[in-house]
Amino acid sequence: MTDITTPFPATPHKLGLYPVVDSVEWIARLLDAGVTTLQLRIKDLPDEQVEDDIAAAIALGKRYDARLFINDYWQLAIKHGAYGVHLGQEDLDTTDLAAIHRAGLRLGVSTHDDSELARAIAVKPSYIALGHIFPTQTKDMPSAPQGLVELKRHIAGLSDYPTVAIGGISIDRVAAVLDCGVGSVAVVSAITQAPDWRAATAQLLQLIEGKE
């Protein structure tokens, strides 16, 4: 893991609603619906198969002046000038963090326990994601859910960092998550599997950011 001596560029302390989606189509829909922080997460495909989609998503993010993070594909994120990159713990050892830093991109890092939190803090990221908070079907997780007590404990020690809670957060759980002091709530199925994604997005924006 590359030693980083200066912090990655800052993001707002409260990133608000943070949908994580797997297609440019979802990026376009959510930007049009007023979302300003979001992540494109396409998994396990060669760079040449995803570059067009990543470039298109980044262009959309710039058009809407949004904070678009690219999951994993850091070289393409640098090439096309993304707002930021999001990495899992398993990516920290294999990614050229210094290259991301030199390019001026923001960095978000996933964490699941105290040891991973320490690793994340060591690279001085722009934000730290804490999860998974509740059981989730969206992604296979080797760790147990953190729950609200652990979330609150972790956030209490991260006052210098923007924080993002992720994992199994449905609309009816948002208020309890926010009460833990987190600055952002990441969602997947709460939007993508909602019977009416527009209504769900509007409700989440109102709950998390106070947007009508």
UniProtKB/Swiss-Prot annotation:
Condenses 4-methyl-5-(beta-hydroxyethyl)thiazole monophosphate (THZ-P) and 2-methyl-4-amino-5-hydroxymethyl pyrimidine pyrophosphate (HMP-PP) to form thiamine monophosphate (TMP). 2-[(2R,5Z)-2-carboxy-4-methylthiazol-5(2H)-ylidene]ethyl phosphate binds at residues 136-138, 168, 188-189. It comes from Serratia proteamaculans (strain 568). The gene is thiE. One of its GO terms (cellular component) is cytoplasm. GO terms for biological process: thiamine biosynthetic process; thiamine diphosphate biosynthetic process. It comes from the Bacteria. One of its GO terms (molecular function) is magnesium ion binding. Pfam families: TMP-TENI. Belongs to the thiamine-phosphate synthase family. Pathway: Cofactor biosynthesis; thiamine diphosphate biosynthesis; thiamine phosphate from 4-amino-2-methyl-5-diphosphomethylpyrimidine and 4-methyl-5-(2-phosphoethyl)-thiazole: step 1/1. This is Thiamine-phosphate synthase. Keywords: Magnesium, Metal-binding, Thiamine biosynthesis, Transferase. 4-amino-2-methyl-5-(diphosphooxymethyl)pyrimidine binds at residues 39-43, 71, 110, 139. PANTHER family: THIAMINE-PHOSPHATE PYROPHOSPHORYLASE (PTHR20857), THIAMINE-PHOSPHATE SYNTHASE (PTHR20857:SF15).
